[in-house]
Structures are given as C-alpha cells and as structure tokens.
Amino acid sequence: MASRKRTSGAPKATGLRQGLATYGDAGFSLFLRKAFIKAAGYTDDALDRPIVGITNTFSDFNPCHGNVPDLIESVKRGILLQGALPLVFPTISIHESFSHPTSMYLRNLMAMDTEEMVRAQPMDSVVMIGGCDKTLPAQIMAAASADHPAIVLPVGPMLVG
C-alpha cells in the first residue's frame, strides 16, 4: 500500500477532519460527514474529540470471541474517560472449524479488510479486539500496515462446551 504521509508543513488533521471524501470542497465534505454521524446522536463537542476506532471480530460463528461485547464496552469507557470518542466497527471474523475450505486465506483477507477500514475511516488510533490463531495475526498484520497507532487486545480464553 502507498504511504499516506503528509508532504506539506500543515498540521495533521485529526478526528472527523482527516481523510475527507474528495468532493472538491473540504467544507462540504466535512458538513456531509457531520450530518450523517449526528444522526447517531453525537454532539458537536463529542465530534471535536480525537477518534479512537474499536474494531472487533465478534460473530455467532466464532465461539472464541463470545466475550467481545463486554470487552468493547470496557474499552469504550476507558476511551471516553481519556476524552476521546470511541467508534466501533466490525471486520471479518474467522474460526477454524467454520471456515471452508481453510481459514488461512481468510486470514489474509481479514488483514486487508482491517487495514483498509482503519485507513478509510477518520480515526486517530485504533484498538483491535480479536482472538484465535488467525484473527490475531491478521490484526497484527493490519496494524503494521495501516500507519495508525494501534493496540491489539486479545479476547482471552474461550469457554469450552
């Protein structure tokens, strides 16, 4: 992937102001972005904060990740306490016994999906919540390539049936 480094001396845009869609008018692009996100109930104050994305691999097909909803809520609380805005988004979820023909090629697809979602969304950093032997490597690969500060949070042990 090509690096998206700044070439000018201008300060780096943060929060919702970064990575605006190219409509030819940055003000209009920001207006559209805010109009849509405000429909989710966010205030102007919240939208002026740094954004921390929280990506996760929760799926009913993936018993390894059964505690992900609780982890998401804990991470969101911590981010809010630090004055940032947490925004949650999903990525592909892989479980070995539910993947046909094999989960290995899905690992690479998940890495690309996660990297591109992190790059495409206006976030200042990201917390990646996942587990198992394919999703964690995919998230680490994405974190290494996405050029955003990232924390990978393993889900911990899976409950047995």
Model-derived segments and their meaning:
Residues 2-49:
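N-terminal amphipathic/basic leader segments beginning at the initiator methionine
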Residues 12-21, 52-59, 89-101, 118:
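Gly-rich Lys/Arg/Thr-decorated short loops/hinges at beta-loop-alpha junctions or inter-strand turns
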Residues 26-30, 34, 48, 65-73, ...:
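Electropositive phosphate-/nucleotide-binding environments in soluble metabolic enzymes
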Residues 32-40, 80-128:
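Glycine-rich oxoanion-binding loops at beta->alpha junctions
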Residues 40, 56-58, 71, 89-92, ...:
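Fold-independent oxyanion-binding glycine-rich loops
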Residues 44-48, 52-53, 59-88:
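Glycine-rich phosphate/diphosphate-binding loop of Rossmann-like nucleotide-binding domains
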Residues 104-161:
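Active-site cavity-forming subdomains of large catalytic enzyme subunits
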